[in-house]
A protein has these predicted regions:
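C-terminal and late-domain segments of enzyme folds
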Residues: 435, 439, 443-535
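Flexible phosphate-sensing "switch/lid" loops adjacent to ATP/NTP-binding sites
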Residues: 1-327, 333-350, 357-358, 365-371, ...
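Active-site proximal loops enriched in glycine and acidic residues that flank catalytic Cys/His/Asp
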Residues: 10, 40, 214, 241, ...
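Short beta-alpha connecting loops at secondary-structure transitions
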Residues: 56-64, 243-247, 353, 374-380, ...
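Short, hydrophobic alpha-helical segments
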Residues: 230, 262-270, 397-401, 526-535
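Cysteine-nucleophile active-site neighborhood
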Residues: 13-19, 23-27, 31, 344-439, ...
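Extended hydrophobic-aromatic, low-complexity segments
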Residues: 304-307, 320-324, 338-341, 360-364, ...
């Protein structure tokens, strides 16, 4: 069987959930026994999201191979339970960078380099790249942005060309639109969808299926109307009604026969109905928890929920695994001080201090760590959160009041967190951190080893600073133990506080590897400890 390609575009408005629809369809096809992956093509000029402000773009998701990518790749991995890579996320900036570099190298032999064919050819090359590996039966491609946007035009043109270049049975296009509901008139309006599809068709792309995001069910009359004016069959107009959880969407799409439409259009034969047993079991636990805990998430980007998307989702997975609803309350670390920390963190069954960069909000994180340590509240610190564990312990247990990270003060007498040696000569910010999966050796008998069930693990990283090992003996004698280290470099990856109910800081990002069917052990452990603390 040839590799099949499904292209998913969006219209009317942004943030409709193309990534969730793509992930849901991919999950259904995977559940039929097909080998599936998803790729995201983003229309912004940045090479990657690594240097983007989380307030603008949400979380930067890191893959196993160290690519800094769009947060939608997190959805792809969580739904499918398989790894993505640099090849799964492409931006306009990366496309232009490649083409311009080739032009400088003389690859175009003096020709005038243009959007068509040079940019579109590079887009098409990357769209087809994963299909040439032989690893996948179906590749879904999400086109970022909204149809009609200037930035998206080269991508839509590339899809138009591929529709003609690929065999008809190897290519499918899906268009996601919004059906707004007018409360005054109490009716759903289809005109924005009609106009969006017309724009797509003017660009030469005819959608095979229209997915309509809606707050209210679509009647058969409305579906027929959309089909008539958008030039598709009535059965190819399906609704994506607002769901109580994003993890319910695959089941909703199955009820709407989206996977069946895809299998028929792509002429995929001899595959069974989707096996969604484990997925449904997860949803059942998620929908009917027996317990509830409150976790305080202390961070500096809390105003935008997407800034900590993977952490939020990891708590969903861990909650279901513990038959527990996890209420995550976000606390702006800038607002925390010694006088109000008890008030702001009152009611916490567990505390997580989030990753981040820069000086802003650090003191608030340190106060939160101290509160968790002294009050015996289950605690997890991630990346910068782990580093603040070290700083807090140095100041308040070892008595080094000036202890801090050199990210904040290069002149401190106690640089307990310091820049990694291989980072000190780096001046370029984009893509130069310690990124991707690295091995970690856990100490036998430690809390971490007990949670993981092994002493050899691999986790993903995104940082420039590390625990300063010259102070390791001081910390160990005072009670903060380094229980996880990189086997090659000795870099401290995990610190724990024996005697505390649950106190662990990790330099890596465990949230990136949590999925509904395989919740991450650190998050499961924190939620269980929070439950025990509540009792």
């Amino acid at each position: 069987m040839n590799t099949k390609f499904i292209f998913i575009s969006g219209g009317v408005a942004s943030s409709l959930g193309k990534g969730i629809i793509a992930s849901s369809l991919a999950k259904l096809l995977q559940a039929r026994g097909l080998r599936v992956t998803i790729q995201k093509f983003d229309p912004y000029i940045n090479i990657d999201p690594g240097t983007l402000n989380p307030y603008e773009h949400g979380e930067c998701y890191v893959t196993e191979d160290g690519a800094e990518t769009d947060l939608d790749l997190g959805h792809y991995e969580r739904f499918l339970g398989v790894h993505t890579s640099q090849a799964n996320n492409v931006t306009t900036g990366r496309i232009y960078h490649t083409v311009i570099t080739r032009e400088r190298e003389g690859a175009y032999l003096g020709k005038t380099v243009q959007i068509v064919p040079h940019i579109t050819d590079e887009i098409k090359r990357r769209m087809l790249l994963l299909g040439q590996t032989g690893d996948y039966d179906v590749i879904l491609t999400e086109i970022g942005g909204t149809v009609g946007d200037m930035e998206s035009q080269p991508f839509v043109e590339a899809v138009r060309q591929l529709q003609w270049e690929l065999p008809e049975e190897d290519c499918m296009t899906i268009h996601l639109t919004l059906i707004p509901y007018l409360h005054a008139a109490q009716e759903l309006k289809t005109k924005p969808t009609q106009h969006s599809v017309q724009m797509l068709q003017k660009a030469g792309v005819k959608p095979d299926v229209i997915v309509c995001r809606t707050e209210h069910p679509l009647s058969q009359d409305l579906r027929r109307k959309i089909a008539l004016f958008c030039n598709v069959r009535p059965g190819h107009v399906i609704q994506s009604i607002d769901a109580w959880s994003i993890y319910q969407v695959p089941l909703n799409m199955h009820e709407e026969h989206l996977d069946e439409l895809a299998v028929r259009k792509l002429q995929i034969e001899n595959f069974n109905a989707p096996d969604l047993g484990r997925w449904k079991a997860f949803l059942e636990r998620l929908a009917h928890p027996a317990h509830e805990v409150q976790i305080m998430l202390v961070g500096k980007y809390v105003e935008l929920q997407d800034a900590y998307k993977s952490i939020q989702e990891a708590f969903v997975h861990a909650g279901a695994a513990n038959d527990c609803k996890v209420r995550v309350k976000t606390i702006q670390s800038e607002h925390i001080n010694a006088d109000n920390v008890a008030e702001l963190l009152a009611g916490a069954d567990g505390i997580l201090v989030a990753p981040g960069f820069g000086e802003r909000g650090l003191e608030g994180k340190i106060h939160a760590v101290r509160y968790a340590r002294e009050k015996g509240i289950p605690f997890l610190g991630i990346c910068l959160g782990m580093q603040m564990c070290v700083v807090e312990f140095a100041r308040n247990v070892l008595g080094w009041k000036d202890a801090v990270s050199t990210e904040v003060n290069t002149q401190t007498k106690h640089p307990v967190i310091d820049m990694m040696e291989d980072q000190k000569k780096t001046t370029i910010k984009g893509g130069t951190m310690r990124l991707g999966a690295y091995a970690c050796q856990l100490e036998a008998g430690s809390l971490a080893a007990g949670l993981y069930g092994t002493t050899e693990i691999s986790e993903r990283h995104r940082h420039r600073y590390e625990f300063n090992s010259k102070y390791l003996e001081d910390f160990t004698k005072a009670g903060l133990k380094a229980t996880g280290r990189n086997p090659q470099t000795g870099l401290v990856e995990v610190v724990e506080l024996p005697g505390h109910p649950f106190f662990i800081g990790v330099q890596f990002h465990p949230e990136y590897k949590s999925t509904p069917e395989n919740p991450h052990p650190l998050f499961k452990g924190l939620v269980k400890a929070a439950l025990d603390n509540k009792k």
